[in-house]
Amino acid sequence: MCTSLTTCEWKKVFYEKMEVAKPADSWELIIDPNLKPSELAPGWKQYLEQHASGRFHCSWCWHTWQSAHVVILFHMFLDRAQRAGSVRMRVFKQLCYECGTARLDESSMLEENIEGLVDNLITSLREQCYEEDGGQYRIHVASRPDSGPHRAEFCEACQEGIVHWKPSEKLLEEEVTTYTSEASKPRAQAGSGYNFLSLRWCLFWASLCLLVVYLQFSFLSPAFF
C-alpha cells in the first residue's frame, strides 16, 4: 500500500521499467525509512543517489524550497534460485531553515525525475546483481534549478555522515552537451549587443572628444593672431 503520491509514483515507474529490463524475474520495491548506508545483510548490494532534484514543503510554516542534493539510498538483493529480487529504498529528508523546527520534511519529485532516477537504479542493479554492463548513469543537470549552496546542517543525509560528491563521471555526453549549449545561449545573446561601457568604447569616446576639442581649437586659433 502506498503511503504517499510520490511513493506510488516510485513503485509504478519501478515495476514498469523492471518488467521491460528483467521480465523473467519478479522484483519488489519497499520504502524503508530506517535504512542505513553500508549496513548490508549478506548478499545485499548498495546504490547511493546523491544528486536527485526534489521540492520540499514544510508541514509547519508552509515554506517550500528546491534542492538538487536529495540523497536516496537503495539496498538490493537478488535470489537467483527463486528468480526474485527486492529493493529497499530510503529518501533522506531535510529540515526547514525558515522556521527552525526539528520536523524533518519529505521531498516530492516530478515523474520525469523519478524515471531518470529509476533508470540509474536499474543500471546499478544490472551491474551488481546480474554482473552485466549496466551502461551509463543519467544525471539531469540541465533540468536542475539553481537552488544555491547545499546547507549540510539541515540535511538528514549529511547529519548521518553521507558525503555529497560531485556528479558521477558516467554523466552522459549528450546531456553535458545539452546543458552546455542551453547555458551558453543567454551568454551568446547577451554578448551580441554592444557594451558601451567597455574599454574599447571608452577609448573611442575619449579619442572622439579629443578630436572635437582639437578641431574647435584649430578653427578658433586664427582669431588670436
Swiss-Prot record:
Its main location: membrane. It is a single-pass type III membrane protein. Signal peptide: none annotated. It is found in: Cell membrane. Residues 1-196 are cytoplasmic. The chain crosses the membrane at residues 197-219. A zinc finger (3CxxC-type) spans 52-161. GO terms for molecular function: olfactory receptor binding; zinc ion binding. GO terms for biological process: detection of chemical stimulus involved in sensory perception of bitter taste; protein insertion into membrane; protein targeting to membrane. One of its GO terms (cellular component) is cell surface. Expressed in circumvallate papillae and testis. Residues 220-225 are extracellular. Keywords: Cell membrane, Membrane, Metal-binding, Transmembrane, Transmembrane helix, Zinc, Zinc-finger. Interacts with olfactory receptors. Specifically promotes functional cell surface expression of olfactory receptors, but not of other GPCRs. Belongs to the TMEM7 family. This is Receptor-transporting protein 2. It comes from Homo sapiens.
